[in-house]
Structure formats: C-alpha cells, structure tokens
Amino acid sequence: MSDMFNGSSSLKELNLNNFNTNNVTNMECMFYECTSLKELNLCNFNTNNVTNMRNMFSGCSSLKEINLSSFNTNNVTDMNKMFSGCSDEIKMMVKSQVKNIKQEAFEDYDDDLNN
C-alpha cells in the first residue's frame, strides 16, 4: 500500500473503514503530499504486520482529524517523518496499541515538541 494515494492533492476526505489491511507490511508515503486532505478515518486499519510507516502522512498540511484508534505499531521499525509537514492543530485519536513512537515521527512537524 506504499504510495497508494501519494500526491493526490485534490483529495479532501477519505473513509477507508472497509479496507482489508491484514497482510500489509509497507505503508510508506501512503498519503504523502495529500495537501487538501482534511479528514481521514482509518479506525478499522489492521496494522499488526506493518513494519514501515515512514512519511505515511507527511505533507498532509490541511489534515485536521485522523482516527488511528485501531493502529498497532508493535512491529513498526520505521516511523521517520510520519507526520512531517502536518498542521499543529491536527486531532489524533489513538489507543494504547500505538507504541514506540519516537520524536523522529514528528520531524519537521509544524509544532515544537520540546515546549
């Protein structure tokens, strides 16, 4: 699923509730540079086998709300720049399965994580 919606700059809203992601291992750049995307519902994504989420939402500068409540990141080894270029006003819904997120995931994020 890497690069699946990469560069879809006119995409404003996306609901992928019914996507079967059980066997997916790579989600790198999946939504990269979807600059008009404001809302993204991934609440049923199975990420148990995913190892790469690098730049997954990078450049989604209009994104205001994202539902990651089903995400399990236990096997993810690369989250670099996952939210790079995202608005600092983004609302993220996550649960306890989201682990091991390092600061690199927010590299070049529009907000200062050190404050």
Q: What residue ranges belong to the model's regions?
A:
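Negatively charged
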Residues: S2-N115
